[in-house]
């Protein structure tokens, strides 16, 4: 059994020299961590006032950044959403390459390739008739996969906290890493696909002409036409469809199942695509497991801020500290 290293840090430069002379090659990973921890404390001894300034700078920057982001989102939501989506897409790529997370990189490349193709199809004019259904099916699939992955990851974390991993002879750190990884995958791709779907939904719906962001639709909606994809509806609301059913909203407008699910759940729309009347989701989705969960949506919004803007804010704080000579 390896001996336990007791690290005593002396004062000033002498203490730092003692720590620098420790041979790290013969130590266990835990002992190496203790030595590194002691070195950090020795390096920053006597910097309490400087650290207090750095904390104040961090808090002030977070408050100012939050106010600026809120104002930007309220005044120019379109540019805010586009910049946030771009950062959500590329910021993790930097950390993935830097930290050699190759599994995440492979999944990111596959998701980006298919999503780029789907987004390209959604932004073409004239819009191909099969494109809206392709877009909503793809993003609805990713939504379900990410939701299920997040649930499994959350359950793995909770089981680890309650010690149930010991029943399967799994180490707590391995079980926790597995749960947190799945939870992050589910939440990250859940945020990304919802933002892409919202952008595609607005673009396609305005191109088809039954929906406009402001003002009246440019086309009149027939009773047998879906306002999301513009295609004919062949299955009656009261009939059971072979591939998909037909849904009727509280405003009496009817839609394909995949289209309205993609519009409301994935595209984050809470109004009718044609008349903009508020959608009663509880009435439309009678099964409680199908209802979009409010807390899940709020959690995705929080993760969007964390991934897209937190690295930028931390970078600004580090730049201020560097200019002021704080460390």
Curated annotation (Swiss-Prot):
Organism expressing this protein natively: Homo sapiens
GO cellular component: endoplasmic reticulum membrane; Golgi membrane
Keywords: Acetylation, Endoplasmic reticulum, Membrane, Metal-binding, Transferase, Transmembrane, Transmembrane helix, Zinc, Zinc-finger
Entry-linked InterPro entries: RNF121/RNF175, Znf_RING, Znf_RING/FYVE/PHD
Name recorded for this polypeptide: E3 ubiquitin ligase RNF121
Residue numbers bearing the N-acetylalanine modification: 2
PANTHER family from the UniProt entry: E3 UBIQUITIN LIGASE RNF121, RNF121 PROTEIN
Name of encoding gene: RNF121
Pathway membership: Protein modification; protein ubiquitination
Entry EC no(s): 2.3.2.27
Record-annotated membrane-spanning stretches: 50-70, 79-99, 100-120, 148-168, 172-192, 306-326
RING-type zinc finger segments: 226-276
Lipid bilayer topology: Multi-pass membrane protein
Presence of keyword Zinc: yes
Recorded GO MF terms: ubiquitin protein ligase activity; zinc ion binding
Chemical reaction(s) catalysed: S-ubiquitinyl-[E2 ubiquitin-conjugating enzyme]-L-cysteine + [acceptor protein]-L-lysine = [E2 ubiquitin-conjugating enzyme]-L-cysteine + N(6)-ubiquitinyl-[acceptor protein]-L-lysine
Biological process according to GO: ERAD pathway; protein ubiquitination
Biological classification of the source: Eukaryota, Metazoa, Chordata, Craniata, Vertebrata
Compartments, record wording: Endoplasmic reticulum membrane
